[in-house]
A protein has these predicted regions:
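Hinge/lid segment of periplasmic solute-binding proteins
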Residues: 1-28, 41-53
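Extracytoplasmic/periplasmic, Sec-exported soluble proteins
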Residues: 23, 41-44, 62-66, 85, ...
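Short beta-strand->loop
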Residues: 17-26, 33-35, 41, 54-68, ...
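Extracytoplasmic/periplasmic substrate-recognition and gating elements
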Residues: 138-175
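A short acidic, often aromatic-flanked loop/helix-cap motif at beta-alpha or helix-coil junctions
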Residues: 2-7, 69-70, 113, 155-158
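A bilobed periplasmic-binding-protein/Venus flytrap-type ligand-binding module shared by bacterial periplasmic
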Residues: 32-37, 75-79, 159-171
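Ligand-binding pocket segment of bilobal, Venus flytrap-like solute-binding proteins
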Residues: 62-66, 70-74, 78, 82-150
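Solvent-exposed loop/turn segments at secondary-structure junctions
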Residues: 28-29, 37-39, 59, 67-71, ...
């Protein structure tokens, strides 16, 4: 009764009867960008995944060091489902990422926080929860630039984290 029904409905995609999992948070994957650095580079704020292939951003792009999230960016850029099983679409996405690699400063996970707060990159692919932390930290540090978040118009990954108790857990009562 204390869990938003929308969470329970979302979790039915993998737990149809809501018997084995308890959802606790959800989020998106998007692009965090430094408004000051983009202004200095003469690059408009990103609105599409394709903006991460803009050569003016060479050395200023942080990509997720995650096969799923990196491929999601390339697949969505090309108008495909992030869950594509098509060999041709996956091959095209792979080539897109290979072509993008010279523009990428780093493939990171947690380091995107420090790099974006430190003004070390203009754009970064990031989870929405991390974005909230980064924006709060930027305000508390009194930074002279804004960090903004956008979900590209082609769409994104909407994710849901859930707790489960493994069948072979030793202390199920304590969970």
């Amino acid at each position: 009764d204390q869990i938003d029904p929308a969470y329970m409905e979302m979790s039915q995609a993998f737990d149809p009867e809501n018997k084995y999992s308890v959802p606790y948070c959800w989020g998106t994957v998007g692009i965090l960008y430094n408004t000051k650095l983009l202004d200095e580079l003469g690059v408009p704020a990103p609105t599409k995944w394709a903006d991460l292939w803009d050569e003016r951003l060479s050395g200023e792009i942080l990509m997720q060091d995650s096969v799923r999230d990196a491929f999601m960016v390339a697949l969505k850029k090309d108008g495909y489902s992030m869950n594509s099983e098509s060999k041709d679409e996956l091959e095209q996405a792979k080539q897109e990422l290979i072509d993008q690699k010279p523009l990428v400063q780093a493939y990171v996970i947690d380091q995107v926080r420090d790099k974006m707060i430190g003004g070390e990159a203009a754009v970064g692919v990031i989870y929405s929860g991390e974005m909230l932390y980064i924006q709060d930290e930027a305000v508390s540090l009194g930074l002279d630039y804004d960090l903004e978040y956008v979900i590209p118009e082609e769409g994104t990954n909407l994710w849901l984290d859930s707790w489960v108790i493994p069948k072979n857990a030793k202390n199920k009562e304590n969970a």
